Amino acid sequence: MAHPFQTGLQDATSPIMEELLHFHDHTLMIVFLISSLVLYIISIMLTTKLTHTNTMDAQEVETVWTILPAIILIMIALPSLRILYMMDEINNPSLTVKTMGHQWYWSYEYTDYEDLSFDSYMTPTQELKPGELRLLEVDNRVVLPMEMTIRMLISSEDVLHSWAVPSLGLKTDAIPGRLNQTTLMAMRPGLYYGQCSEICGSNHSFMPIVLEMVPLSYFEKWSASML
C-alpha cells in the first residue's frame, strides 16, 4: 500500500504489476538519457559563442535526428504493446467475481456460488479500530484466493466509476450498461487497498476497495461460512 511522502510506485503483488514496474523503469531511463542530452546541448549553446558552420545545413544530421527518435519510440512501444496484450489475456479463470459500482459503495457477487454477494461500504472514522486506515477500511472485504487466476466483471448501476487496486496493477472503468472484465492474480497473502478512480459525485473519495488475499483452504472455509 502507499505510504506518506512516497515518491515511487507501490510494491508489485501480481505478475502484471511487476511488468508495469519494469516498463516504468525502462521508459524512465530513456527519458532521463534524452533529458540529459538536451540539457547538455543547451548548456553548451549558452556557454560558448562559437558556431559550427558545417551543421547549420547538414542532411546527415537531419537524417540522424529523424531516424533516432523513431527507433526510441519503437523501443518504448514494443514493451508497452506486450504488456497491453498480457493485461487483456484471460486464460480459464478459477473464480469469477462481479463488481457493481454505486453512489457511493461497491457490491460484489461471486458468480460461481449461489447467494454469495454483499455490499461494501467505507467504515466511518468514528468506528475505526486501532491500526485501521482512515478512508480505506470497509465493512466487508473482498476475500479471494491467492496464486489463482480470478476474473473480475465490472459495471455500474448509476454513473461512471473506476475499480482500481494499484498494488495489483488494476484499473478498470465501471460503465453503466457495459460489462468490462479484467483478471488478477496475487502472489502473496495480505490486504490490498484501492479506491474509485473516476470522479463520480460528492462522495467519490469515500469508495475504498479492500482485497484480502488468502490461501485456498482459508477461502473455502470463508465461502462456506458466507453461504
From Swiss-Prot:
Superkingdom: Eukaryota
Intervals, Mitochondrial matrix compartment: 46-59
Record Pfam families: COX2, COX2_TM
Enzyme Commission code: 7.1.1.9
TM region(s), chain numbering: 15-45, 60-87
UniProt binding sites for Cu cation A2: 196, 198, 200, 204
Residues the entry annotates as binding Mg(2+): 198
Catalyzed reaction equations: 4 Fe(II)-[cytochrome c] + O2 + 8 H(+)(in) = 4 Fe(III)-[cytochrome c] + 2 H2O + 4 H(+)(out)
PROSITE patterns: COX2 (PS00078), COX2_CUA (PS50857), COX2_TM (PS50999)
Membrane topology: Multi-pass membrane protein
The record's free-text note on cofactor binding: Binds a dinuclear copper A center per subunit.
Entry annotated with the keyword Phosphoprotein: yes
InterPro entries: CcO_II, CcO_II-like_C, CcO_II_C, Copper_CuA, Cupredoxin, Cyt_c_oxidase_su2, Cyt_c_oxidase_su2_TM_dom, Cyt_c_oxidase_su2_TM_sf
CDD domains attached to this UniProt entry: CcO_II_C
Sequence positions that bind Cu cation A1: 161, 196, 200, 207
GO CC list: mitochondrial inner membrane; respiratory chain complex IV
Subcellular location: Mitochondrion inner membrane
GO terms, biological process: ATP synthesis coupled electron transport
Listed cofactors: Cu cation
NCBIfam families: CoxB (TIGR02866)
Subunit structure and binding partners: Component of the cytochrome c oxidase (complex IV, CIV), a multisubunit enzyme composed of 14 subunits. The complex is composed of a catalytic core of 3 subunits MT-CO1, MT-CO2 and MT-CO3, encoded in the mitochondrial DNA, and 11 supernumerary subunits COX4I, COX5A, COX5B, COX6A, COX6B, COX6C, COX7A, COX7B, COX7C, COX8 and NDUFA4, which are encoded in the nuclear genome.
Protein's name according to its UniProt entry: Cytochrome c oxidase subunit 2
Organism from which the protein derives: Ailuropoda melanoleuca
Gene: MT-CO2
